Amino acid sequence: MAKDALVSVELASKFATEKETPYTRWVAAEGLDIISAHYIASLLTCDLKPWARRGGKGVYINHEASRTSNDCYVCEIAPAKQLEPQRQLFEEMIYVLSGKGSTTVCNDAGKRVTFEWQAGSLFA
């Protein structure tokens, strides 16, 4: 802050637009960034970071720049690799940008379903 500032750092921080929240701390703990934007020129060229919990690379995108969990993410699966299993507590919609592969899902009763996907596939 400039030496001749009219307000203290403490007061200025109360008006900061980028607030830290439990959600932003969780994303940071995942090792990922959040892109706050309404428009991204190409999802294929987003900067991705290693995502240890998922076993791939990723970045979160927050549509409303509201720094809350109203978001989506880009996740890259390396060729001939797989993501770590994840239990879903919510619905998730997947759109495949490129590549092809297969996914296995199972429910609490143990029923497993495997299906194949490719670029342009959409599944939930």
Where are these regions (language model features)?
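Conserved short histidine dyad/triad with adjacent acidic residue
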Residues: 54-60, 71-88
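Glycine- and acidic-residue-biased ligand/ion/polar-headgroup-sensing regions
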Residues: 78, 88-108
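Short beta-strand segments in beta-sandwich/barrel cores
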Residues: 72-73, 82-83, 99-105, 122
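Intrinsically disordered, low-complexity regulatory regions enriched in Ser/Pro/Gly/Thr
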Residues: 66-69, 87, 95-97, 116-117
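Short histidine-centered beta-strand/loop micro-motifs
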Residues: 61-64, 82-88, 105-106, 114-115
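A short, N-terminal "cap"/entry segment at the start of jelly-roll beta-barrel domains
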Residues: 1-68
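Short coil/loop residues immediately preceding or within conserved phosphate-binding loops
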Residues: 72, 91, 112
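Short acidic-glycine-tyrosine-enriched beta hairpin
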Residues: 77, 107-124
